Amino acid sequence: MASQGTKRSYEQMETDGDRQNATEIRASVGKMIDGIGRFYIQMCTELKLSDYEGRLIQNSLTIERMVLSAFDERRNKYLEEHPSAGKDPKKTGGPIYKRVDGKWMRELVLYDKEEIRRIWRQANNGDDATAGLTHMMIWHSNLNDTTYQRTRALVRTGMDPRMCSLMQGSTLPRRSGAAGAAVKGVGTMVMELIRMIKRGINDRNFWRGENGRKTRIAYERMCNILKGKFQTAAQRAMMDQVRESRNPGNAEIEDLIFLARSALILRGSVAHKSCLPACVYGPAVASGYDFEKEGYSLVGIDPFKLLQNSQVYSLIRPNENPAHKSQLVWMACNSAAFEDLRVSSFIRGTKVIPRGKLSTRGVQIASNENMDTMGSSTLELRSRYWAIRTRSGGNTNQQRASAGQISIQPTFSVQRNLPFDKTTIMAAFTGNAEGRTSDMRAEIIRMMESARPEEVSFQGRGVFELSDERAANPIVPSFDMSNEGSYFFGDNAEEYDN
């Protein structure tokens, strides 16, 4: 495992805090959750939502999006400088769903961004509370990761669509800060860097002048974030090469794609956080629960306990399966899009099935969809056990895995051996062995080839009963290894593309 001494814990990233002890961290994360909850309650009042309507996940998403848009300074500035017809840069809004005469109706609401900012700050004791905004971004990102497979985006940057287990956080906005960087997968970082290098190849001035200097600083920072995710010296040394390149070009793109592939076996450490929709925090705060006083952690039992006691509803299209919709949201809430399905199933206590077998589309409803036939149902977000979220990629061993996703990225700290199809992965490493990174490449390939099952399974704590809040009695589940566990395998999930 990479030395953790120099890194801040998630919660410190989450709250932009300096070194704090566990109690202070739990309190500051709790304070962030309180703020989101208070904001949500106020918005439900403004919008005159009934209790049921306030617990509707689609309404939650609209309200979350409104506040994120109100605080998106870059985009707001851009919109004011480039006015587009029919779009008021000072307003934000979206669809709000209400129950009228036994039917669901869609109502488009519009608010001044200034007003939304005022409500948000008021709910957060006058602060901008960036941590709370980032928290909502990560929830949206986790939902996207669970709903869509990024095949097209991978292919566009020259990567293999089967590397989708590396793509956590690929839809997070750039402004998501340290907490956002922590949850981005290796593939996401590689993709961002490749896009940057391609711009540099196509635009002579990209690295030049005052702007170019800022670009260069951003490039090196992204390289360092990616380097910090790798756990072997050779992978890190290769990242140093990429970062120090005077004029990044195709050689660097090659190196980055090589590194992304290597991460299927020599996995990076990627953080996982359970970020829940605002409509879960709102009712909890309304019922008098004081998150700051009680303390809260995004990586422990707290989100599981909160979901055990929450009622969340969702609109359901005529041919969708409510149980499948529940699975989608459960996975998003637990940041488990790239976890092994056997582990998720064990923790959830009901079978978690691959994306392609789910009869459900995304959670959001498009503006042209017919509301007349729309029903609603309760989302089942409870779990049988809980487990600590991990930030280690674990190691891997030779197991048969599938034709689609060829690896996973563990979410839960649970001991298991990891499925991946070594032959498939190693076949991708033919070709370029010369050039300035040849010795590192050779070393990385050697490590991948010698990955042996016994020394490289994922060592975790195990799962815990929900009554075991102190994580005192780990239960180590045994998994049927004949069954592999990728979520996106042999798959036809919709594409995420704006």
From Swiss-Prot:
Keyword RNA-binding: yes
Chief location category: virion
Record's protein name: Nucleoprotein
Region: Disordered, residue numbers: 1-22
Function: Encapsidates the negative strand viral RNA, protecting it from nucleases. The encapsidated genomic RNA is termed the ribonucleoprotein (RNP) and serves as template for transcription and replication. The RNP needs to be localized in the host nucleus to start an infectious cycle, but is too large to diffuse through the nuclear pore complex. NP comprises at least 2 nuclear localization signals that are responsible for the active RNP import into the nucleus through cellular importin alpha/beta pathway.
Assembly and oligomerization: Homomultimerizes to form the nucleocapsid. May bind host exportin-1/XPO1. Binds to viral genomic RNA. Protein-RNA contacts are mediated by a combination of electrostatic interactions between positively charged residues and the phosphate backbone and planar interactions between aromatic side chains and bases.
InterPro entries: Flu_NP
GO biological process: symbiont entry into host cell; viral penetration into host nucleus
